[in-house]
Every structure is written in C-alpha cells, then in structure tokens.
Amino acid sequence: MKLQVLDIKGNEIKEIALNDYVWGIEPHQQAIYDTVISQQAALRQGTKKVKTRAEVSGGGRKPWKQKGTGRARQGSIRAPQWKGGGVTFGPTPDINYKKSVNKKVRALAFRSVLSLKVKENNLVIVDKFEFAKPSTKEMVVVMKNLKIDDQKTLIVTKEKEELVVKSSNNITGVKTISANQLNVFDLLNATKLLITEEAAIAVEEVYA
C-alpha cells in the first residue's frame, strides 16, 4: 500500500510504500486481547500478604492440657481456627501473575493494531521532526498543522529523540516512545499514531 508522508507543516511531500502484511491485514481481535492481557499481567506486583500461624505473634503456650477438660484438644491460640490466628494458604507476595503469549500471536497482535490505525485513518506519517530546542509551543503548532491537536496521540520515532520527548511531555494525552519500545497497549490506548518515516520502516522490518 502507499501512504502519504507529511512534513511538520502538514504538507504532503511524498508517498511511502508500506507492506500490506504489516499495515493492511484484517485485525485479529483475540490476538490483540491476549497480548494486552499478557502485557498488563506482567506489570502486576505481588503486594498481598497475610501471616501464617508461624508468623502471628503469640500462641507459644498450649492453651489447656491435652486431656481431662472435656474440650477439643488445642496446641496454640494462633492456629487458623482461632480468632486472631494465622491464615492457611493465604496470598503471598511471590505470586506470579505472568501470562505467556507466543511470538507469533504477539506479532499478529502488532500487525493487527497497526492495520487498525490505517483502516480507521488514525495513522499520520511525518518525514522528521525539526526542533532547535525543546519547545512545547512548537510541538502544539506541529500537531495543529497535522490536525491531531485534539486527539490522544502516540508519537513514535526510530530512536529516542530528547527534543521531541521534552517538547511533548507537557501536552495532555501525548506520549512519545522509540520504535523499539512500541507495544500493543500504547497503540490501542492512543487514538492517533504519529510516526516518523524512519520509524515506520524500522517497525515494518521487525514484523514483515
């Protein structure tokens, strides 16, 4: 497929030929879902923790003698059946929330989301960004020129460009990453994908 490449003033300057296998497939919803769940699960931390009977304070003495009281035998007042006792099989912080997704499914999810951006006219390709210094004001002007200033936008450059990152940091709804940091969740979370020509080629080389 061929798509227009714009300059930062919003002018069409040339066409770029992109691989239909990466940018023009029918989106696979299940692959997208599985990949996002896997990505989100990997971010979870084990923060739940309860004390076992060995960790609860007290309960070192046998509450009453073994025989002769008529009551059930008890070894500790911190056994699980007692109020204030330890918890049996409770949550621990070392739980593993990770959900694995194989490489083929993950790659299919990437191609699906990229194709979805093209299909919905939410992909904008620019030749390059030109900033002499970090400037939020200039970035706002660029986004207005590209007619995406009121959209939640993911900006992707081939490599990390400090001037672009610093120029966009203070703009609400805008996130800037490099091509090797691209992920399905960020792509889905943004309405518009603003990507440089170099970054688009780099992404295509990975998933073609």
Swiss-Prot record:
<dbReference type="GO" id="GO:0006412">
    <property type="term" value="P:translation"/>
</dbReference>
<dbReference type="InterPro" id="IPR013005">
    <property type="entry name" value="Ribosomal_uL4-like"/>
</dbReference>
<feature type="region of interest" description="Disordered">
    <location>
        <begin position="50"/>
        <end position="83"/>
    </location>
</feature>
<keyword id="KW-0694">RNA-binding</keyword>
<keyword id="KW-0689">Ribosomal protein</keyword>
<dbReference type="GO" id="GO:0003735">
    <property type="term" value="F:structural constituent of ribosome"/>
</dbReference>
<protein>
    <recommendedName>
        <fullName>Large ribosomal subunit protein uL4</fullName>
    </recommendedName>
</protein>
<comment type="subunit">
    <text>Part of the 50S ribosomal subunit.</text>
</comment>
<dbReference type="Pfam" id="PF00573">
    <property type="entry name" value="Ribosomal_L4"/>
</dbReference>
<comment type="function">
    <text>Forms part of the polypeptide exit tunnel.</text>
</comment>
<dbReference type="InterPro" id="IPR023574">
    <property type="entry name" value="Ribosomal_uL4_dom_sf"/>
</dbReference>
<dbReference type="InterPro" id="IPR002136">
    <property type="entry name" value="Ribosomal_uL4"/>
</dbReference>
<dbReference type="GO" id="GO:1990904">
    <property type="term" value="C:ribonucleoprotein complex"/>
</dbReference>
<keyword id="KW-0687">Ribonucleoprotein</keyword>
<comment type="similarity">
    <text>Belongs to the universal ribosomal protein uL4 family.</text>
</comment>
<comment type="function">
    <text>One of the primary rRNA binding proteins, this protein initially binds near the 5'-end of the 23S rRNA. It is important during the early stages of 50S assembly. It makes multiple contacts with different domains of the 23S rRNA in the assembled 50S subunit and ribosome.</text>
</comment>
<dbReference type="GO" id="GO:0019843">
    <property type="term" value="F:rRNA binding"/>
</dbReference>
<keyword id="KW-0699">rRNA-binding</keyword>
<dbReference type="GO" id="GO:0005840">
    <property type="term" value="C:ribosome"/>
</dbReference>
